[in-house]
Amino acid sequence: MPAHPPIKTVAVNTWDFLRKPMIAPTGFREYDARWKYPDEINLPGMQALGLGIGTQMHEMGVPPHIAVGNDYRDYSLAIKYALMTGLSQAGITCHDIGPALSPMAYFSQFHLDLPAVAMVTASHNPNGWTGVKMGFEKPLTHGPVEMARLRDIVLAGEGIAREGGKIIEVDGVMDAYIADLVGDFKLSRPLKVVCACGNGTAAAFGPKVLEAIGAEVIPLHTELDYTFPHYNPNPEAMEMLHDMADAVKQSGADLAIGFDGDGDRCGVVDNTGDEIFADKMGVIMARDFAALYPGSTFVADVKSTGLYASDPVLKAHNCTTDYWKTGHSYMKRRVHELGALAGFEKSGHYFLSGDIGRGYDCGMRVAVEVCKLMDRNPDKSMSDLKDALQKTYTTPTLSPFCPDLEKYEALEKIIADLEVHAKEGGTLGGQKIKEIVTVNGARCQLENGGWALVRASSNTPNLVVVTESPESDAEMRAIFSDLDAIIQRQPNIGEYDQMI
């Protein structure tokens, strides 16, 4: 029996809010679903989403079994139960793995031999957000095609109820996940590591994993607290990175590793307190992997440094890098398609495959691999490994506000303006635009090897801006200033989340 279409405007504190599904259509993103709760979705709406996911599973011929987990937010458990109610209504058996990291949920597909996964999480979004990451083909998660079809099923009320659904509570997945991460590896050198969790879900995992491999752990906000009393756990944000840097300086640690709210991303600070942006950390890891697996293919997202293409160590080991669309689902799929050894995103998603991972993004797996890297270089510090890279000057990820319903149109106009600017011989930071790559937004390649990127965020009402210079901090800032002047021509651009 088909469902009724949900109400597309959420009316909080009304009679219907407690009974009828209400879902803002903007929550269906390119590769997952995210809403402000309860302003953009209610619990009956989440039940309708579960019914839609279950209906899509039947439509795609996926066996009716799914792993379901939730992150550590005060409302995530209620949302998970609503989602599982809808999945069960669709005739799906839900294997409830309990509170989890997103990569633990992905791991559970392999551990429990299940075809599908649904993880209730808002990822690194701040409190007040919720969402679901889902996938029907391990280790992959939904991309734009699957998300568009899911959106249509849910918003048109095409979910179909079936018999046979149920919920099974599964214990032991967390212990199995940690054991899988640790394996038989033990550090052979002393290593003092600041473990930064921002009081998010990773606090239940990070210290245990690092201690199990023999690291001396310096805890930083490793108490579970869903109010996030210090800051939102996001290792791409300078606030968290600065806190990690201060902890390194105060403790004399060898490095700091920080995790986001659902543990699929991580960030690194070296022994001097320098923040290593995730794309640069990826080059350090790629160099290490290249020596172990020469001839490997890597994937980097379009926000990442140009060093993947120019690094002499990667070239010496006959390694190649494919630049691809930003987004965890895009990157997972690209790594899978190319048979790449690893993929790296500037946001801190790393996709380790082949002999070093299963292809999904797992901050805990990366933490272990970073420690292994240090173990393979016993005479070097993290700053030594960082300083061995060619020096470039890169902004953090900068995100000006732009409404969800307007950001893609605004981006198209910005790209058109950039193309005219380039055609007329215009410059960014005094450097002529050599090429504009539009695989994901616009990445302007400059004559001296610098670049500037503007794209639309897939997860939040923002654009995303990054610039890099091989010459100087001043040129990096000048590139940003010139790009921002073009961006600001659009009337619907708001304030940046952070500035350089």
Spell out what each predicted region is:
Residues 2-85, 89-90, 116, 167-193:
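An N-terminal, well-structured beta->alpha segment
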Residues 17-23, 130-251:
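Gly/Ser/Thr-enriched, mixed-charge loops and adjacent short helices
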Residues 55, 63-129, 179, 208-269:
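N-terminal small/polar loop signature for handling phosphorylated ligands or for N-terminal nucleophile
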Residues 71-79, 197-204, 304:
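Glycine-rich phosphate-binding loops at beta-strand->alpha-helix junctions
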Residues 115-129, 248-270, 275, 322, ...:
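Glycine-rich phosphate-binding loop
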Residues 293-466, 471-500:
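Phosphate-binding and adjacent anionic-ligand microenvironments
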